[in-house]
Amino acid sequence: LNAFVTEVIANSSFTEIDRIYLANRVMSLVGEEAAKQETAATSLIDLKDDLLEVALAVGKIGSTLAEQDILGAELMNLVTPAPGQLNQQFWQTYEQDPKRAIADFYELSKRNDYIKVKAISKNIAYQTPTEYGDLEITINLSKPEKDPKEIAAAKKAKTSHYPACQLCFENEGYQGRLDHPARANHRIIRFDLAGREWGFQYSPYAYFNEHCIFLDSKHTPMAISRATFERLLDIVETFPGYFAGSNADLPIVGGSILT
């Protein structure tokens, strides 16, 4: 517990004066037994994982991945600036150095475990020769499928239409539930795109380096039009160093055969 609080202070705007407050907030989430536990972990994310084990052992959470993710996101929210503060910091830095502002946001998203760096490292990637040139094959092991218990529990859960989808702005800071991912430590950078408010966020389970998402602040059906290409060009001007593409405007893109 003390080691986790030390890392929170080192990676946030909290100061040493906040130590007792932080310890009490963490104990309220994982149980007071955490204060007695010894650990060899040193990194913020490993310390968070140790606290999740304590919470599981004392019955603060169940064994489902969803419950662990909800608590984990709540713990890592302690090192995540509030949306208003983060956006102010981002655009202040952007005025001096746009690439630095983007890099800082990316580092925060890794440091607070929104981008699942530890899980992504489990992915397998290799090159294989083809008649068209070398093809990169990736096996995604980082994004876990739901286990049968979670699927059964989700079916029994009361239907909710909030947030409207897993990408929209309503996810920022959302606690999460069995059938919707935890987003307490999730943040979105706001920016103007052709007179409308849009958002810039990273993908938690990246399929490629610095995999990010640009989205309209309003939940609207996907549509490909001339405006789509105008937006793409504006995006790459606003966010130097990145390239942008668009999803297809199909009713369903992706999904799981388990549900």
Task: For the regions a language model picked out, list residue spans one by one.
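Helical scaffold of the NTase/Pol beta-like nucleotidyltransferase catalytic core
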Residues: 185-189, 220-244
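A short acidic-Thr-Gly-centered motif at the start of a beta-strand
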Residues: 192, 235-236, 249-250
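Histidine-centered divalent-metal-coordination microenvironment in nucleic-acid enzymes
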Residues: 210-216, 249-259
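Active-site microenvironments that recognize anionic phosphate/pyrophosphate groups
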Residues: 1-224
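Short Pro/Gly-enriched beta-strand edge/turn motifs at strand-loop
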Residues: 171-172, 243-245
